[in-house]
Design a protein with these regions (language model features):
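Lectin-like carbohydrate-binding module/patch detector with strong preference for beta-trefoil
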Residues: 1-3, 7-8, 795-930
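C-terminal region of N-terminal signal peptides and the immediate post-cleavage residues
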Residues: 5-20
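Acidic/polar, glycine-enriched structural segments that form the non-catalytic walls/loops
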Residues: 18-51, 57, 61-329, 349-353, ...
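Catalytic cores of secreted or luminal carbohydrate-active enzymes
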Residues: 77, 85-93, 646-693, 697
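Carbohydrate-binding surface patches
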Residues: 131-140, 689-717
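Surface-exposed beta-strand/loop patches in extracellular or lumenal glycoproteins
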Residues: 148-158, 705-721
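The feature captures the catalytic groove of carbohydrate-active enzymes
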Residues: 234, 310-330, 381-439, 448, ...
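Active-site core of glycosidic bond-cleaving carbohydrate-active enzymes
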Residues: 332-339, 344-368, 376-380, 410-432, ...
Length: 930
């Protein structure tokens, strides 16, 4: 690393923009929700002809990936076609090739309604998955009313459906038994695809054993509709089930079908914490877009009986037939943690219920597995990799099972903290909602997870609890892993509190209270992880948290286990002190530094530690390293496959919410790590069924509003450190907390009331009013070399393209003057070889420029202190630039060596040099694809 990082101070009030406004008025926080959400619409300037360019539609139990191959292709996906999560089929509508092949094609996914809109060649399309039933609806206008049309649904080699046709409905139905894998359930599962159409003369036919088709003529006005249903299916009458599902929808008025669709999604967004962010370089807008897309995808995939994601993968938007990246019958909790967290902080608690049910409903099976595989111990050792029916896989000695002593040493054999982790999420969701019935339902999972940990760990001669276990997947079978210590310290008091609330398990409460005093201190080690150090080593300021009490044990995976106490276990805060300093050192010297995997949690850890600049830089770096799909989904590495990962999106959503608002330990923190230079208006759900609305403008909070959902006393950290603040009623402005400069203060709140935390010298109510507003996206959005959507003409050229740059400073083209021997300068009125450059993707979110003048790479010479010059034969950091897309369609170049923007100095009269911190006309260039 270039240097050590320290937490940034809280945002200064003096930095607030002179034109600050507030969206708070008359007791409410005003957001133009439809248009703020639509800022993140996914825009198609060209047809998304490849499956890897597919767009997501779904209702939570039926998901689809939609792209333009064969006119229109949609793969149907469900989470309950177990154990393989097999697709019910792919729908194609070849007659839409006229639209997708037209020169004027364009489209966009409206995230606010969940409707895909496309047009071209005089035709239009609207496609959506009904919010209220498991069917895909495709409405078309502008077709030739006299030309025959068709639609088909197909399966592929390896599938054995029963294909049938009756009247206007065709079906593909298949069942199978879960009896092939270790730990199989013996249950019957299956898939059913039902296809019909609205038009004239609709008739279904069986094409072959894996394909059915509907033939029809459009209505007289050139309109037609295709509907494809895919419900839960375990056998029965396919025809009757299909007929009952589709009903009269083929002929129903579009307005009637869309009204329920629009109503459901409008209600969803109205109850979600919306966030709008802006920065001059577009990074904040890009992160906002990823978060909004995440909220859409989560609602479109996580409302079924089985979680729609099981290994960080967006299974419900698979476009690769039945191919799955990971064992589709199993769930990895590690890869769900940021989804669970983001669902809570955005207020979408219902989306976590399928996950919680997976564990609670399987609790008897988990306990049986624990007794069988963990030496007869009581309680629940929840398998980190758990099959949908509650076991850890193959029980054989040496097998790669989870919670399995016979399987140790192995990836998850002695990973014993997953029960504690899922239990903590249950407790946190209770704290956020105050729903006692929810807590009562899932408390057994908490109780049994704690019971197991008590039994698994033994008190040693030092009076402390000890065990040999995995440090998750990073160290196997080591002494006292940090994950175990964190699980004990976080879970035990939560279970005690829950048991007291429910008036139960007094004996367990006593045991857990005793055990809390028996947890060993965090293992410390040196920066090289070569030895165990005592807690007293903290005084030297050169120790870090170790992964376990065996720091030199073999490293198996790339997880920063030493930061688990920070998040998700919530045990080390940003409060000043030796423990916080230890955690900051641990972050700065973490072994796995860089983009790593797409589930990288650096930005979340940085937010918890108050390291605002790291939040921004890590979000950008991880996104540029892993987002490989135009719908915002990522890859575990950086390759395009057959289904994307959603866990990078959820990591962004979690980090943004944590940077804006935190209250995990009962102290409400406002913008504790919000990046400088990013303005934001957002709402975050916190404890007590409460929402907090925050606006940061010009580097300072300008609106802090609490909308209380319960009556209690809230502890609030002063958003303007050292400044006099007060709290007033959000409707009547009556003073609730008088002027104070205290670091933290108590705010008594009443359910249903709102409160403004404001500076005495600059009250929120004195600011001019402006609602949080936005405009629907009209073009693809870019972040360096990654993008959301597809450009039309004038978009970013592909890797290796020949480009030129036209300076806004003077309207001239940039040249590698004197055949490249002189610095780059914008002084040519036409493009020749000296004005042409190869644009080469560097794979890390940056590009390099190779001059045609001399076939050498452009460098920000002398670490950016000297003008740009085409003089080197290999690419290093001096030769890397981030390609920034500006709102007016121009681009800017940000040097990776010094972080400054390239400018056409002196209105273009002087050579190009990277020495500007902000973008103005001199830093803007038109990118010409030669």
């Amino acid at each position: 690393m270039a240097g050590l990082l320290v937490p940034t101070a809280a945002l200064p009030a003096s930095a607030a923009a002179a034109t600050a406004t507030t969206a708070w008025q008359n007791g409410s926080f005003h957001v133009d929700t439809p248009n703020v959400v639509r800022r993140s619409d996914i825009v198609l300037g060209k047809p998304n002809s490849a499956g890897a360019q597919s767009l997501p539609l779904g209702n939570g139990s039926l998901g689809t990936a939609v792209w333009a191959a064969n006119g229109f292709t949609a793969q149907l996906n469900r989470s309950d076609t177990l154990p393989g999560r097999k697709s019910p089929g792919q729908v194609t509508i070849p007659g839409l090739s006229k639209m997708t092949g037209a020169a004027d094609f364009k489209g966009y996914l409206d995230l606010y309604t969940g409707v895909l809109n496309e047009s071209g060649g005089g035709m239009t399309l609207k496609a959506w998955v009904s919010a209220t039933k498991d069917e895909l609806v495709v409405d078309v206008t502008g077709a030739d009313p006299n030309a025959a049309q068709s639609a088909s649904v197909s399966l592929w080699s390896g599938r054995s459906p029963q294909a049938a046709a009756s009247g206007a409905i065709g079906t593909l139905a298949e069942t199978w038994v879960d009896n092939q894998e270790a730990g199989s359930s013996g249950r019957t599962f299956g898939s059913l695809a039902a296809l019909s159409a609205g038009g004239r003369g609709v008739s279904a036919q069986v094409v072959n054993s894996t394909q059915v088709k509907v033939n029809f003529t459009p209505n007289a006005d050139g309109s037609f509709r295709v509907i494809a249903g895919a419900p839960t299916w375990t056998g029965g009458s396919a025809g009757s089930t299909a007929s009952a599902l589709l009903g009269s929808d083929a002929a129903a008025a579009e307005s009637s079908l869309l009204s329920t669709q629009q109503s459901w999604w409008a209600n969803y967004w109205a109850n979600s914490g919306i966030l709008e962010a802006n920065s001059s370089d577009g990074q904040a807008q890009y992160m906002e877009t990823l978060r909004t897309i995440y909220l859409f995808m989560e609602a479109a995939s996580m409302r079924g009986a089985i979680p729609g994601s099981q290994a960080g993968v967006a299974d419900m938007f698979n476009f690769g037939q039945d191919h799955q990246n990971w064992t589709p019958s199993a769930t990895w909790l590690w890869n769900l943690r940021t989804q669970i967290s983001a669902n809570m902080s955005s207020g979408n608690f219902a989306l976590n219920i399928p996950i919680f049910n997976l564990y609670q409903n399987n609790l008897p099976a988990i306990e049986a597995w624990t007794k069988q595989q963990m030496g007869g111990l009581p309680g629940a050792c929840v398998p980190e990799v758990m099959r949908f029916n509650g076991n850890g896989g193959d029980p054989s000695p040496g097998a790669n099972a989870a919670c399995s002593r016979p399987g140790s040493p192995n990836w998850n054999a002695l990973d014993v903290t997953s029960g504690a982790e899922i239990s903590l999420y249950v407790w946190q969701q209770y704290q956020d909602t105050g729903d006692v019935n929810f807590l009562r339902t899932y408390y057994p999972l908490m109780r049994d997870s704690a019971t197991f940990l008590l039994a698994y760990q033994k008190v040693g001669s030092d009076g402390k609890l000890h065990a040999v276990a995995n440090a998750h997947e990073t160290q196997w079978a080591v002494q006292d892993p940090t994950t175990d210590l964190a699980a004990d310290a976080a879970l035990f008091p939560a279970v005690v509190s829950a048991a007291k609330l429910l008036n139960t398990d007094t004996s367990l409460q006593t045991q857990l209270t005793t055990a809390l005093g028996q947890i060993p201190p965090w293992a410390r080690t040196d920066y090289g992880h070569t030895q165990v150090l005592p807690p007293s080593a903290d005084s030297s300021n050169n120790d870090v948290i170790a992964w376990s009490y065996q720091p030199t044990a073999t490293t198996r995976n790339g997880e920063n286990i030493d930061l688990e106490p920070v998040w998700p276990y919530n045990l080390i805060t940003d409060d000043p002190g030796a423990l916080h300093d230890l955690a900051v050192r641990t972050y700065n010297h973490r072994v796995f530094y860089g983009a790593g995997n797409d589930w990288n949690m650096d930005a979340i850890d940085a937010a918890r530690l108050g390291m605002a600049s790291e939040v921004a830089s890590r979000l950008v770096a991880i996104t540029q390293a892993h987002q490989v799909y135009i719908n915002g989904l990522s890859d575990l590495g950086s390759s395009v496959g057959t289904e994307g990962y959603i866990e990078q999106l959820s990591g962004v959503a979690t980090a943004l919410d944590e940077a804006l608002v935190q209250d995990y330990d009962g102290t409400l923190r406002i913008a504790p790590a919000w990046p400088a230079g990013w303005d934001v208006s957002g709402t975050v759900a916190v404890q007590g069924n409460t929402r907090v609305n925050v606006q940061v403008q010009g580097g300072s909070p300008v609106t802090v509003a609490i909308q209380a959902g319960s009556s209690r006393t809230m502890k609030v950290r002063n958003p303007w450190p050292g400044k006099a603040v007060q709290v007033v009623n959000g409707s009547g402005n009556a003073v609730v907390v008088s002027s104070t400069t205290a670091t933290t203060f108590d705010v008594p709140v009443v359910s249903g009331q709102s409160y403004l935390v404001e500076q005495v010298a600059a009250p929120t109510t004195a600011l001019p009013y402006a609602q949080v507003s936005g405009s629907p996206a009209t073009t693809a959005r870019h972040l360096g070399t990654v993008q959301i959507g597809i450009d039309g003409s004038g978009g970013t050229p592909g890797n290796g393209s020949v480009v030129s740059f036209k300076a806004h400073a003077n309207g001239d083209y940039v040249t590698a003057d004197n055949a490249g021997a002189a610095p780059l300068i914008a002084n040519r009125t036409a493009i020749g070889p000296w004005e042409q450059f190869d644009l080469i993707d560097q794979g890390n979110g940056s590009v390099a420029l190779r001059a045609h003048a001399n076939d050498k790479y452009v460098t920000a010479d002398n670490a950016g202190a000297d003008p740009l010059l085409a003089k080197v034969t290999a690419v290093g950091t001096w030769e890397q630039f981030q390609l920034v897309h500006n709102g007016d369609g121009s681009v800017s170049l940000k040097s990776m060596i010094n972080g400054d923007y390239v400018t056409a100095e002196n209105a273009g009269a002087d050579p190009l040099i990277a020495n500007r911190t902000t973008i103005g006309p001199w830093e803007e260039f038109d990118l010409i694809d030669d």
